[in-house]
A protein has these predicted regions:
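Protease-domain processing segments flanking chymotrypsin-fold serine proteases, especially trypsin-like
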Residues: 41-146, 189-198, 202-282, 286
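Extended extracellular/luminal ectodomain segments enriched in beta-structured repeat modules
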Residues: 149-156
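Solvent-exposed serine/threonine-rich low-complexity stretches and specific carbohydrate-binding patches
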Residues: 180-189
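Serine endopeptidase catalytic core focused on the charge-relay Asp
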Residues: 198-383
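Solvent-exposed strand-to-loop "edge" motifs in beta-rich extracellular domains
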Residues: 160-162
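Bacterial N-terminal signal peptides
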Residues: 28-37
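Short, surface-exposed beta-strand/strand-loop-strand elements in extracellular ectodomains
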Residues: 164-178
C-alpha cells in the first residue's frame, strides 16, 4: 500500500518505488480559494474547514522582520561618511508599463511583475579591510555603503558571495527611516547568486555591525545585481475598482482566517514577481513545520530541496479597517530566508493532468499569531 507523502499532507502519494506520482495527486481545496469568492460551499463543509483552520491559530513565535536599529542614530549622524558606491538613474516607466501590459494581456496564467533586474556597471567587491569602520560607545563597530536606484519603491541585492564571520551581522536599511532587516546568507551559498531580503526606499544602505572582538577583516562579499521594485501589488489591487472586495469587510468565519493568507515574492529572469499563498495546517503535530501552499506557476523553475532559495513571504498586508488604506507590501512583517520546495505539479488548474499547485516549507517561522488555514481533500461542489 502506498504511504502518504507526509510533508505534503495527503495530496500526493509516493509510488511503489518511493517516487512522487503526480498522476495520483488529490485536489486540495484551501481557504485562499474561498477568500477569493470562487466557490459556493454548503454549510456543513464550511464548518469543517473553518474548524480545521482554527487548529493553527496558536502563536508560533518569530521576531518582526523590520526593526529600529539601536545604533541607527550614531550612524545617521555620520551619514556624510557613508559612501555611495552605486547610483543608477530611474528606469523608463513608459517602457515598463508597455512590458507589463503585454505580460498581463497574455492568455497564459502568470504572475504579477513588480520589479526589474538591473545590472551594475561592474561588480562591487568589498571586504572588512576596505570598509570604513566607526566604533560605537559599547565597543562594537559599524560600517556601511549606500546603493541608489532612482524612483525605486524598494530593492533587493544580488550577491555572488557574502562571507559573514562570527560576531558580524549584515543589515539592509532604508536610509531615510533607519528601518532595517537582517541579511543572513545561507550556509550553502546558492549558484549563481543569492538574493537578500527586500527593503523599502530608493537609497538603501548595506550596514555591517561587528561585536567587540569580532574578526572584521574576514568579512567579504560581491554585489553584482539589483532588483528594482517599482510596483506595490497591494496598492494596485486597492485602486483596481469595485471588483476587488476588501477582505477586511468580510464577516465571520472569514475575518479570523485573513492572517493566514500571505504574499509571496520571488525572482526569476524576468524580474521580481508577486503571488499569493496560504499558511496551512500540518498533519505532523510533533513537528508542526510552517507549510505554505501556492500555485505552481508562481514558483516554476525552482525545484529541489533548495530550489526556493530567493522566496520571501509577506504577512498582514490587509487593511486594518473595512475599505481602509492598505500598508505598503515592503513595510509589513515578512518571513525571509527562502523555503524548501517539497512537492508541486504544473498544469492549468482547470484542465489537463496538473492542478497548478506547490507545497513549500518555510525555513524561518512566520510572525506569531497567524492562523494556519484548514484544508480538505473533499471535492468542492459546483457553484
Amino acid at each position: 500500500m502506498r504511504q502518504p507523502f507526509r510533508e505534503g499532507g495527503t495530496w500526493l502519494h509516493r509510488g511503489d518505488k518511493g517516487g512522487i506520482t503526480p498522476g495520483r495527486a488529490i485536489r486540495v481545496v484551501f481557504i485562499a480559494i474561498l477568500l477569493g469568492g470562487g466557490l459556493a460551499w454548503p454549510a456543513e463543509m464550511l464548518k469543517k474547514v473553518s474548524a480545521e483552520a482554527r487548529l493553527g491559530g496558536a502563536a508560533i513565535g518569530a521576531e518582526p522582520a523590520l526593526r529600529a536599529l539601536p545604533w541607527w542614530s550614531s550612524l545617521r549622524s555620520a551619514k556624510s561618511d557613508v559612501p555611495v558606491v552605486i547610483a543608477l538613474g530611474a528606469p523608463d516607466r513608459s517602457v515598463l508599463r508597455a512590458e507589463d501590459a503585454k505580460r498581463e494581456s497574455s492568455e497564459e496564467k502568470g504572475t504579477l511583475r513588480i520589479g526589474i533586474l538591473r545590472d551594475l556597471p561592474a561588480p562591487f567587491e568589498f571586504s572588512g579591510e576596505t570598509l570604513s569602520w566607526t566604533q560605537l560607545a559599547d565597543g562594537s563597530f559599524v560600517a556601511a555603503f549606500s546603493v541608489i536606484s532612482g524612483e525605486a519603491l524598494g530593492m533587493r541585492f544580488g550577491f555572488t558571495s557574502l562571507v559573514m564571520p562570527t560576531g558580524v551581522m549584515a543589515w539592509i536599511v532604508d536610509s531615510s527611516t533607519g528601518a532595517g532587516i537582517a541579511c543572513v546568507p545561507p550556509e550553502a551559498f546558492p549558484e549563481p547568486l543569492w538574493w537578500g531580503p527586500s527593503c523599502a526606499g530608493q537609497e538603501i544602505w548595506l550596514v555591517f555591525h561587528a561585536r567587540p572582538g569580532a574578526n572584521k577583516a574576514a568579512l567579504s562579499g560581491s554585489l553584482v545585481k539589483i532588483a528594482h521594485i517599482y510596483r506595490d501589488p497591494v496598492a494596485e489591487a486597492k485602486a483596481a475598482g469595485s471588483c476587488n472586495i476588501d477582505a477586511s469587510c468580510a464577516s465571520e468565519p472569514w475575518a479570523s482566517m485573513l492572517s493566514g493568507v500571505g504574499g509571496l515574492g520571488t525572482i526569476d529572469s524576468t524580474g521580481v514577481l508577486f503571488c499569493t499563498c496560504s499558511l496551512i495546517v500540518s498533519l505532523d503535530t510533533c513537528e508542526n513545520s510552517p507549510l505554505v501552499l501556492t500555485a505552481n506557476h508562481c514558483v516554476r523553475g525552482q525545484t529541489g530541496t533548495r530550489g526556493a532559495e530567493n522566496l520571501e513571504f509577506y504577512w498582514l498586508y490587509q487593511t486594518s479597517t473595512c475599505n481602509g488604506m492598505p500598508p505598503s507590501i515592503l513595510t509589513v512583517p515578512r518571513t525571509t530566508g527562502g523555503s524548501d520546495y517539497l512537492a508541486g505539479i504544473g498544469g492549468s488548474g482547470y484542465s489537463g493532468l496538473g492542478s497548478d499547485v506547490t507545497l513549500l516549507r518555510l525555513r524561518q517561522e512566520p510572525p506569531a499569531g497567524l492562523t494556519r488555514l484548514g484544508w480538505t481533500t473533499d471535492m468542492p461542489p459546483n457553484g
